[in-house]
A protein has these predicted regions:
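Beta-strand-loop-alpha-helix segment that lines the small-molecule cofactor/substrate pocket
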Residues: 66, 70-71, 77, 82-131, ...
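Aromatic/hydrophobic pocket-lining residues that form π-stacking "cages" and hydrophobic walls in ligand
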Residues: 44, 85, 112, 138, ...
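Predominantly a Rossmann-like dinucleotide-binding segment in NAD(P)-dependent oxidoreductases
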Residues: 12-18, 122-124, 129-218, 355
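Conserved SAM-binding strand-loop segment of SAM-dependent methyltransferases
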Residues: 53-59
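Active-site loop of classical SDR/Rossmann-like NAD(P)-dependent oxidoreductases
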Residues: 42, 266, 306-318
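C-terminal helix-rich "cap/oligomerization" subdomain common to oxidoreductases
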Residues: 1-3, 8, 71-73, 110, ...
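Contiguous beta-strand/loop segments that form the cofactor/metal-binding neighborhood of enzyme cores
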Residues: 174-278, 315-327, 331, 346-348, ...
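N-terminal Rossmann-like dinucleotide-binding module
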Residues: 1-51, 71
Length: 372
């Protein structure tokens, strides 16, 4: 079988090449990188040299037409370009490895998925943690009953300079995906989006809506609290709130899974920090229970794998994408996962807009902040 022809789309100065979505293909045997597209002249020349490709294009559409790749890395982080790039790739018959978050709105996500379905191509999104062998161990421990019945999940963003709306979009997308990995599809969301000021913390208004960075569209608020309802009575929360934080202090980014017999706490990455606490009271200072690390080998066992960072996660994703293409199945980090994570994010703003809990999937496919 001839190698798969791979092309790369980046945009220097506007999201560049994401978190290594261009160079991941160096580690994959069954492919040949044939071309790169970048609208920036200097960036394009640098990428051509970095990827060791003969052909480089200013216009990605021209590249798709001339090179006819089987797979394309849509690597730029700027979301305002994702829909058009993905639809063009799908129409050219190419499967896609896409930087996260998926796009700006559910309407855009719907259009991207419709194009991929129509042209029978696959799309894998860069949720590196979803492919982590440590996450597989987490699911196995939950299935074994090690934390008992799941009662609650608590997620937080990084709460750095992006606190609030931008944190929700950029880092919240990972937390939403982890919640779904653990508990399945959410059924409802109730949220409050607020803004701090001289008069304290108040609900957002239209005047608080601003354009987020990296082409992500409108964002708002610096105090966000969201609650999600899952099957079996499981509740998940996501928070991102402005507070005092000193330079160099650890952030609170990650997810806690709280069960009737214990707790699992994790963050993101190819081999993320993951720990288990056998304490039904969730109070180790009282119980004297000790946290145990969960590795790819199991609970309390040494980690046999080397942590290759997000790059290793990308390798696992594209290997799975190649297998998904060969077997005509959905990737383990699919376009449907990308849309579902975005749906949970949009539900936060929709709940704030209508002033009540909203059912998922959302009926409103436009950005709720444009409707205030």
């Amino acid at each position: 079988m001839p190698p798969q022809r791979v092309a790369v789309i980046g945009h220097t100065g506007r999201g560049n090449y994401g978190h290594g979505l261009d160079i991941v293909w160096r580690s994959i045997d069954q492919v040949q990188v044939v071309a790169v597209a970048d609208a920036d002249d200097k960036g394009r020349a640098a990428a051509q040299q970095r990827l060791k490709v003969k052909n480089a294009y200013a216009d990605y559409r021209q590249m798709l037409k001339k090179e006819r790749p089987n797979i394309v890395s849509v690597a730029t982080r700027f979301l305002d370009e994702h829909r058009d790039m993905v639809v063009a790739c799908a129409e050219a018959g190419a499967s896609i490895f896409l930087e996260k978050p998926m796009c700006r709105t559910l309407a855009e996500a719907d259009a991207m998925i419709a194009a991929c379905e129509k042209h029978h191509v696959k799309l894998a999104i860069a949720f590196q943690t979803r492919l982590s062998p440590r996450l597989e161990r987490v699911r196995a421990l939950i299935a074994e009953g090690r934390i008992g019945e799941i009662l609650e999940m608590r997620g937080r963003g990084k709460e750095d300079s992006r606190v609030g709306g931008q944190d929700l979009m950029v880092l919240g997308t990972h937390i939403m995906d982890l919640m779904r990995y653990v508990a399945g599809e959410p059924r409802w969301c109730f949220a409050r989006v607020a803004q701090s000021g001289k008069q304290g913390v108040r609900p957002i208004t239209k005047a608080d809506v601003r354009e987020g960075g990296e082409g992500m569209g409108p964002v708002a608020g610096d105090h966000i609290t969201a609650m999600y309802g899952f099957d079996r009575g499981i509740v998940g929360t996501f928070s991102s709130q402005r507070s005092e934080r000193r330079q160099g202090e650890d952030d609170r980014f990650g997810l806690q899974i709280l069960g009737s017999r214990g707790v699992i706490q994790l963050t993101t990455g190819s081999l993320p920090p993951v720990f288990f606490l056998a304490d039904p009271g969730w109070f180790p200072a009282r119980s004297k229970a000790a946290w145990q690390e969960i590795t790819s080998a199991g609970l309390g066992k040494p980690e046999p794998l080397k942590d290759g960072g997000l790059g290793q996660g990308n390798i696992w994703i594209v290997r799975d994408l190649l297998d998904a293409i060969a077997k005509d199945r959905q990737p383990r980090s699919s376009m449907y996962d990308g849309r579902a994570s975005l749906e949970m994010i949009m539900a936060v703003y929709e709940s704030q807009r209508v002033g009540r809990a909203v059912e998922l999937p959302l009926k409103n496919r436009q950005h709720p902040l444009t409707m205030l």
